[in-house]
């Protein structure tokens, strides 16, 4: 864009001459801007016409002209940033933002938060890291998963704060008396984000893709066939009853995208821009449910400019502040919640070959060493876990046996950053017991396969739990390679039988009870130990309303709204 190039050229002049009156020649300006003298004269005339500089030349060979820069580059960038954003030219604004990375935070701050521009409510969020591609079959990050729920619809969906699956692309569904046939009735007039009609045959193709994908296949393991007996009816025929099915179809692995393009969905927002420094969502004008209040949501990504706050939490991914810098004194915690998900320690027993006494001693040391309590005080964003889910207490381990721990153990930890601290502190605790802990970092946010897990005795990772906690915990046992890695073949087979039995129980409370008992057995056997939960928080200035935290710690984009600004 020409204006970006002009700003770059003017920046060179300003760096050379500043705001003071300076003596120079056209030849010197041409050398500074790496152009011909003829082009330099044209540029000087243009900058003078724009009011950026003054130029007074004198007649005669060798005479020097008087040049003065009238505006700072920062002022010009701020002016054009405002103009581009008001015009909706986010591409130009993005190019302008990339012009001076070291000044990006100051440049963007006045435009962050909620604003009305061109009669449309816009929410801009500064974000601390690059985002993964928003492919439902590959994305692993918490922010990415939240965005995928926003972009893609399913046959069913979870509303924020409600654990029961609700209608989405399907307006109703019915189940046969034997629980083996489920029919989902599609809404008429459904459309993809590009405006094309959404057809049942396309959903059938997408479901076929999901059934063959490694990540989502376990969610469909009990399904014999999926057919389209009518243009607006999808029918699932099961090998055994599965009363989690409506929950599964609302979950991330079953989000329905266009069969030819995994980034094209039918959710409340559509993906307009996905670039290194900017993600832009726009309202889906053909959305089949209540339309969001916001027209546009933008993530401005500035990973190198996020400064640690005094309390160590401002830029942490579980703490989100919406607004401009001058709003921060007014920003208040509008929503707080304890994460249902948790960070955990898993033990690969058939690799470590620890005895039950050694295992009890190891877990007792984790629970009584004060590692988690110290981390809670130091970071201020976590709480040591006492329950796996509300009403699912974690056993306390004790050991009267002084049998030594293994001389050497290998631990692999994943993000988030707190798990690195836990690993380092645990290394000190175990060293005092004569056990050397070898720590290895994994940069994956999820376990890729069981081979990765088989290389470690101990594993530290984060488990996200969605709006329907029990359904999420059941899916975890099916979907996460962790369990294939830490369970012996016989344990894995027994777990599959247990899950098959539980899924056939029609009464939800009894399903939940038996699932809780299974997890209690896993904890008592020392396979899994929840460590801590996060304290999710969203801060916002008074003018931003309807901020509702989701189970993933983000806020529901469909509920937030801004009152119109006075004219």
Residue ranges and their predicted role:
Residues 21-27, 33-39, 51-57, 399-462:
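Ligand/substrate-recognition segments at binding pockets and active sites
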Residues 286-328:
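Ligand-site clamp/hinge motif
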Residues 66, 216-262, 266-278:
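Surface-exposed binding/hinge segments that line
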Residues 130-144, 196, 246-251, 539-558:
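A structural "hinge/loop" feature
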Residues 282-285, 335-361:
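A bilobed periplasmic-binding-protein/Venus flytrap-type ligand-binding module shared by bacterial periplasmic
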Residues 48, 58, 361, 365-398, ...:
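Detector for C-terminal structural segments
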Residues 18-22, 41, 140-142, 172-214:
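Aromatic- and charge-enriched surface segment that lines or borders ligand/interaction sites
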Residues 126-175:
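N-terminal lobe/hinge region of extracytoplasmic solute-binding protein
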């Amino acid at each position: 864009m020409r204006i970006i190039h002009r700003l770059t050229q003017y920046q060179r002049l300003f760096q050379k001459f500043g705001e003071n009156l300076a003596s120079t020649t056209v030849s010197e300006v041409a050398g500074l801007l790496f152009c011909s003298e003829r082009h330099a004269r044209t540029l000087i005339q243009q900058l003078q016409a724009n009011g950026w500089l003054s130029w007074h030349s004198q007649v005669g060979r060798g005479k020097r002209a008087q040049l003065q820069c009238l505006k700072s580059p920062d002022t010009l960038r701020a002016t054009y940033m405002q103009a581009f954003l008001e015009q909706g030219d986010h591409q130009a604004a993005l190019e302008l933002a990339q012009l001076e990375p070291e000044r990006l935070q100051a440049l963007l701050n006045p435009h962050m938060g909620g604003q009305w521009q061109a009669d449309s409510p816009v929410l801009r969020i500064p974000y601390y890291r690059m985002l993964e591609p928003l492919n439902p079959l590959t994305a692993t990050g918490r922010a990415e998963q939240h965005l995928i729920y926003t972009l893609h619809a399913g046959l069913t969906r979870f509303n924020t704060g409600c654990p029961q699956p609700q209608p989405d692309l399907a307006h109703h569904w019915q189940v046969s008396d034997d629980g083996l046939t489920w029919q989902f009735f599609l809404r008429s007039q459904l459309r993809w984000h590009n405006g094309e009609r959404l057809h049942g045959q396309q959903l059938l193709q997408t479901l076929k893709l999901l059934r063959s994908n490694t990540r989502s296949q376990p969610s469909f393991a009990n399904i014999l066939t999926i057919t389209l007996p009518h243009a607006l009816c999808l029918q699932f025929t099961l090998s055994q009853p599965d009363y989690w099915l409506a929950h599964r179809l609302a979950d991330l692995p079953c989000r329905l995208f266009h069969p030819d393009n995994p980034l094209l969905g039918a959710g409340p927002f559509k993906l307009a821009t996905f670039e290194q420094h900017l993600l832009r969502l726009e309202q889906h004008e053909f959305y089949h449910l209540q339309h969001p209040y916001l027209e546009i949501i933008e993530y401005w990504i500035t990973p190198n400019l996020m400064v640690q706050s005094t309390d160590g939490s401002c830029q942490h991914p579980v703490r989100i502040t919406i607004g401009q810098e001058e709003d921060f004194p007014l920003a208040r915690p509008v929503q707080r919640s304890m994460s249902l998900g948790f960070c955990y320690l898993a033990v690969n027993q058939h690799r470590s070959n620890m005895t039950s006494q050694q295992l009890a001693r190891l877990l007792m040391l984790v629970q009584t060493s004060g590692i988690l309590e110290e981390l809670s005080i130091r970071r201020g964003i976590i709480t040591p876990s006492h329950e796996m889910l509300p009403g699912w207490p974690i056993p306390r381990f004790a050991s009267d046996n002084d049998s030594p721990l293994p001389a050497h153990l290998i631990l692999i930890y994943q993000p988030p950053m707190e798990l690195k601290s836990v690993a380092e502190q645990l290394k000190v605790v175990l060293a005092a017991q004569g056990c050397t802990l070898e720590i290895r970092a994994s940069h994956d946010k999820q376990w890729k396969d069981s081979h990765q897990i088989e290389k470690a005795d101990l594993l530290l990772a984060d488990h996200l739990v969605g709006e329907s906690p029990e359904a999420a915990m059941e899916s975890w046992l099916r979907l996460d390679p962790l369990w294939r890695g830490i369970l012996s073949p016989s344990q894995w087979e027994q777990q599959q039988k247990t899950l098959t039995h539980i899924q056939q129980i029609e009464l939800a409370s009894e399903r939940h009870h038996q699932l809780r008992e299974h997890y209690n057995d896993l904890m008592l056997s020392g396979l899994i130990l929840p460590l801590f939960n996060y304290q999710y928080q969203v801060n916002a200035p008074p003018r931003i309303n309807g901020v509702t935290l989701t189970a993933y710690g983000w806020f529901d984009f469909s509920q937030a709204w801004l009152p119109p600004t006075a004219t």
